[in-house]
């Protein structure tokens, strides 16, 4: 979840935050509840290094492929599936190394690197942020071997049509539950939150980043419920259909009239299938 208000930290979730409007790249679950165990069997936990330790979510879209956020780029990837309590030694899960990763070619990786660089200063921050476009925030991760499908590990089907504004959705992840935390503490047990799909026009009036047709916005007018730091790449499921992955949002998470922003999966189905077909 990329925080629009605290960009330099958003990927790793620690460090100083520049003054002014924020944008967060790693959403976390705020105002939700503990998911029923293994009720989200497609949910993946991605850990990696990128100067600091990173945590993201992901979605199993094929027995050997996990979809996550492009801004979760790093090294030494490990992916866990079938997990509920990430701190429990007794929780059975499957763990995999990543043999190859494929960020979406249209994602603005150069801008992301600038936002996370030591060279960023307040002046440059305000010059570059308004209207910045973080579309196509997706990355495909090829596992070293196929998963073993069971009650706790299942593939989530890709959508066949776009969701409608007003759809009832839910998101899930192990991200922080504190909307004001600058250190992004993460929860141990998988959290779920209910959200409502909002119009992109309404969303664009709330955020300084560009809202495109390849994005979805979900939240609540009154706020209080949101994804947040550590939830990036996790699923947004609307009316029972996989429609989005967590991308970015405001700081603090869960602000009124500031919905979280998600990648519209329907716009990227062909790319996802092409990656799987070409590299499997």
Curated annotation (Swiss-Prot):
Residue stretches making up the Peptidase S1 domain: 29-277
Glycosylated position list: 99, 121
Claim: Membrane is one of the keywords in the record: no
Cellular compartments annotated: Secreted
Leader sequence residues: 1-16
Keywords: Disulfide bond, Glycoprotein, Hydrolase, Protease, Secreted, Serine protease, Signal, Zymogen
Pfam families reported in the protein's UniProt record: Trypsin (PF00089)
Propeptide: 17-28
Active site feature: 71, 137, 232
Disulfide bonds: 35-192, 56-72, 169-238, 203-217, 228-253
Tissue: Salivary glands.
EC number: 3.4.21.-
GO MF entries: serine-type endopeptidase activity
Major place of residence: secreted
SUPFAM superfamilies: Trypsin-like serine proteases
Record GO cellular component, one term: extracellular region
GO terms, biological process: regulation of systemic arterial blood pressure; zymogen activation
Transmembrane segments: none
Family stated for the protein in its record: Belongs to the peptidase S1 family. Kallikrein subfamily.
Function: A kallikrein-like protease. It preferentially converts human high-molecular-weight kininogen (HK) to bradykinin. Is not toxic to mice.
Protein name: Blarinasin-2
Organism: Blarina brevicauda
């Amino acid at each position: 979840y990329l925080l629009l208000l605290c960009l330099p930290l958003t990927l790793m979730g620690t460090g100083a935050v520049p003054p002014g409007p924020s944008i967060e790249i790693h959403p976390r679950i705020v105002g939700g509840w503990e998911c029923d165990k293994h009720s989200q069997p497609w949910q993946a936990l991605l850990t990696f290094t990128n100067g600091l330790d990173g945590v993201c979510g992901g979605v199993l879209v094929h027995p050997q492929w996990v979809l996550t956020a492009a801004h979760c780029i790093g090294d030494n990837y490990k992916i866990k599936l079938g997990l509920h309590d990430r701190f429990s030694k007794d929780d059975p899960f499957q763990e995999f190394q990543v043999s190859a990763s494929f960020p979406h070619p249209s994602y603005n990786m150069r801008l992301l690197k600038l936002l996370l660089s030591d060279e960023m200063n307040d002046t440059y921050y305000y010059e570059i942020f308004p209207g910045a476009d973080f579309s196509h925030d997706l990355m495909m991760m090829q596992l070293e071997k196929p998963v073993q499908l069971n009650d706790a590990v299942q593939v989530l089907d890709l959508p066949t049509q776009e969701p409608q504004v007003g759809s009832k959705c839910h998101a899930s992840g192990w991200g922080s539950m504190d909307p004001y935390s600058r250190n992004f503490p993460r929860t141990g047990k998988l959290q779920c939150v209910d959200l409502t799909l909002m119009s992109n026009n309404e969303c664009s009036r709330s955020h300084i980043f560009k809202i495109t047709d390849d994005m979805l916005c979900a939240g609540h007018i009154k706020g209080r419920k949101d994804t947040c730091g550590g939830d990036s790449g996790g699923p947004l499921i609307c009316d029972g259909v996989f429609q989005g992955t967590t991308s970015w949002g405001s700081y603090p998470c869960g602000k009124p009239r500031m919905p979280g922003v998600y990648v519209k999966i329907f716009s990227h189905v062909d790319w996802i299938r092409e990656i799987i077909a070409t590299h499997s």
